[in-house]
């Protein structure tokens, strides 16, 4: 049963201003009700549950102590922001999370003044908060900037780049390190909480600053010894030496579920003159919901579920997922070839490489949230004769574009890019859409770019990439399940730059790349019914193009249409360039390009997103009819 829980105290809180009217003694009850409301809401919508459960008390404490939205609160990634949304005027829509027309699953500037900076990709919060803090400093405006970042996100270099530049913000910048994997600190107790309260206080920080100023006037050897001694002592007590070296005052570790600990420490930091400050808060992902606490992934991402049992709704049986097909195909290749390695950037299960890791742990590398390193690491392996597959979501490969260009393409190193989540991705929306990889990869010399039309094609492309040693190669495939075709008993090596004719006709040529092939075939049925004989080609390659086949199709049909799940500048642009180079456009060629719109599309079901983008069968038919000046019945329209 998923009945809504009683929340009498939470019902009185619509905004943080309401929250700040409560007594501190009421906050424990509020946190419990907030947690229950979040569990109830996500049970209806699905989404990211575990991270939000882990920061309920921290969210309450931050909005209680700080004057949001004047004090800006920036959540890294945003998976943990559901409690924040409930407390900031969006509770009435919380059961629309990740639904078409509903709330985003991440923070979003256009959604609320309490979301000062949008997020979805990792490790951006400190840089953004630093920008807000320095802007306030330059304008002599009141207001702190608080970044909440998880310990996993601290594996990305960008977080340290920001911290290395943060000193200029002074006490206007506060970083909350949400350690929910116990990867940095041991369990916290009363002593560490007491020490954290002491070291966050104004007298301690003032005395420490005074001692530093005195030490700087001592002879150099004595000054250096004093500095090392203080760091050693504080490092033993708190583990904060690294952050101190980056110019932060370190406070913690603190029990992130104990409001009696959190409130005075946050108040001390708020009222202090010293900074920037890093508060190390230890939390438990999935806190307060037994099924989540017992699960290996702490219910990080869930389907709709029953609140009482925690049992998640299962999707109806269907074809295997593209991710699963890729993983199985790569494992099969690795069994035949011990030069094959697999690299992921903190997404082993999301990319399917957890299967590879179990089969070949010595050839599997999870480098953390470090896409730039992942690509150059793969380049180094390739330079030594190995066959690395770098499996990264399309949206995250954007973070390593310079490495793709400088370290891979220019040196023509045979790195294999397995690009998951290509095209539109549904509930995760614009921040996770794989819209741009065709454009930014196909423009590079030496690069080969493939797109699988179905799961069988994906198996062939994994094999083709595995044995391709003459330069870098990428294969892209979408989120979700395949179309249900039989998988090949043995993979084939595809000829580089060669497409295939799936259906032959005479009047219309549809040139499809990737999984829009199914819609192209549906459109062909409709066009044939209107008396317009239609050829459908699966180009397979965005680069190099099958120039001979494309030239034949363009010159032997009345109209040709390219169809792709990518942004402007991709397949269509390359086909137009080819037609121009061959002089085909001089003779009145009717060529149309269908691609994603020049806009960031909001979250919705993928099929609705593609219909909105004009990439469904009906839109293809309409494009053809318009090019031929025919009406919806296929009849010629008078000029």
UniProtKB/Swiss-Prot annotation:
Pfam families: DXP_synthase_N, Transket_pyr, Transketolase_C. It catalyses: D-glyceraldehyde 3-phosphate + pyruvate + H(+) = 1-deoxy-D-xylulose 5-phosphate + CO2. Keywords: Isoprene biosynthesis, Magnesium, Metal-binding, Thiamine biosynthesis, Thiamine pyrophosphate, Transferase. SUPFAM superfamilies: Thiamin diphosphate-binding fold (THDP-binding), TK C-terminal domain-like. InterPro entries: Dxylulose-5-P_synthase, THDP-binding, Transketo_C/PFOR_II, Transketolase-like_Pyr-bd, Transketolase_C, Transketolase_CS. Binds 1 Mg(2+) ion per subunit. GO terms for molecular function: 1-deoxy-D-xylulose-5-phosphate synthase activity; magnesium ion binding; thiamine pyrophosphate binding. Its cofactor is Mg(2+); thiamine diphosphate. NCBIfam families: dxs, PRK05444.2-2. Catalyzes the acyloin condensation reaction between C atoms 2 and 3 of pyruvate and glyceraldehyde 3-phosphate to yield 1-deoxy-D-xylulose-5-phosphate (DXP). Belongs to the transketolase family. DXPS subfamily. This is 1-deoxy-D-xylulose-5-phosphate synthase. It comes from Rhizorhabdus wittichii (strain DSM 6014 / CCUG 31198 / JCM 15750 / NBRC 105917 / EY 4224 / RW1). The gene is dxs.
């Amino acid at each position: 049963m998923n009945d809504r829980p009683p929340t009498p105290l939470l019902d009185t809180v619509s905004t943080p201003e309401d929250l700040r009217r409560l007594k501190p003694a009421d906050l424990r009850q509020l946190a419990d009700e907030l947690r229950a409301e979040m569990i109830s809401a996500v049970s209806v919508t699905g989404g990211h549950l575990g991270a939000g459960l882990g920061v309920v008390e921290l969210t309450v404490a931050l909005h209680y102590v700080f004057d949001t939205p004047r004090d800006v609160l920036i959540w890294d990634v945003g998976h943990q922001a559901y409690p924040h949304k409930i407390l900031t005027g969006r509770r009435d829509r919380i059961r629309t999370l990740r639904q078409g027309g509903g709330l985003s699953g991440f923070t979003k500037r256009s959604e609320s003044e309490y979301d000062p900076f949008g997020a979805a990709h990792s490790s951006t919060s400190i840089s953004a908060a630093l920008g807000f803090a320095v802007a306030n400093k330059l304008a002599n405006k009141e207001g702190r900037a608080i970044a909440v970042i998880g310990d996993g996100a601290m594996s990305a270099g960008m977080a340290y780049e920001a911290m290395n530049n943060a000193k200029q913000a002074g006490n206007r910048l506060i970083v909350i390190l949400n350690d929910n994997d116990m990867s940095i600190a041991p369990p916290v107790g009363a002593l560490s909480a007491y020490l954290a309260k002491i070291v966050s206080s104004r007298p301690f920080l003032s005395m420490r600053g005074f001692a530093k100023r005195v030490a700087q006037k001592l002879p150099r050897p004595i000054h250096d010894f004093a500095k090392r001694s203080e760091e050693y002592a504080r490092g033993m007590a708190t583990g904060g030496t690294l952050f101190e070296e980056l110019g932060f005052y370190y406070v913690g570790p603190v029990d992130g579920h104990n409001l009696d600990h959190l409130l005075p420490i946050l108040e001390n930091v708020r009222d202090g003159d010293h900074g920037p400050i890093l508060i190390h808060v230890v939390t438990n992902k999935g806190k307060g919901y037994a099924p989540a606490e017992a699960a290996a992934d702490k219910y990080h991402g869930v389907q709709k579920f029953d609140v009482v049992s925690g049992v998640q709704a299962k999707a109806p049986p269907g074809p295997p997922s593209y991710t699963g097909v890729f993983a199985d195909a790569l494992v099969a290749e690795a069994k035949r070839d011990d030069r094959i390695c697999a690299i992921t950037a903190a997404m082993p299960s999301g990319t399917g490489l957890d299967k590879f890791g179990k089969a070949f742990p010595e050839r599997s590398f999870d480098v953390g949230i470090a896409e730039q390193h992942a690509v150059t690491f793969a380049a180094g392996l390739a330079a030594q004769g190995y066959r690395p597959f770098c499996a990264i979501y399309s949206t995250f490969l954007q973070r390593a574009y310079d490495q793709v260009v400088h370290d891979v393409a220019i040196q023509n190193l045979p790195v294999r890019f397995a690009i998951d989540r290509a095209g539109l991705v549904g509930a995760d929306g614009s921040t996770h859409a794989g819209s741009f990889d065709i454009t930014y990869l196909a423009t590079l010399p030496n690069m080969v770019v493939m797109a699988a039309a179905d799961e069988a094609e994906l198996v062939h492309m994994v094999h083709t990439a595995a044995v391709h040693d003459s330069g870098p190669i990428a294969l892209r495939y979408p989120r979700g399940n395949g179309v249900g075709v039989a998988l090949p008993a043995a993979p084939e090596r595809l000829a580089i730059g060669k497409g295939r004719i799936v259906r032959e006709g005479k009047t219309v040529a549809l040139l499809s790349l990737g999984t829009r092939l199914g819609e192209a075939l549906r459109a062909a049925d409709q066009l044939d019914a209107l008396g317009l004989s239609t050829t459908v080609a699966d180009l397979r390659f965005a680069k190099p193009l099958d120039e001979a086949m494309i030239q034949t199709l363009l010159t032997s049909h009345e109209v040709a249409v390219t169809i792709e799940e990518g942004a402007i500048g991709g397949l269509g642009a390359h086909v137009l360039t080819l037609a121009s180079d061959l002089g085909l456009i001089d003779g009145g060629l009717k060529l149309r390009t269908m691609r994603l719109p020049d806009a960031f599309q909001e979250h919705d079901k993928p099929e609705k997103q593609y219909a909105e983008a004009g990439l469904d069968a009906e839109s293809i038919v309409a494009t053809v009819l318009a090019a031929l000046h025919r009406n919806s019945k296929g009849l010629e329209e008078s000029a």
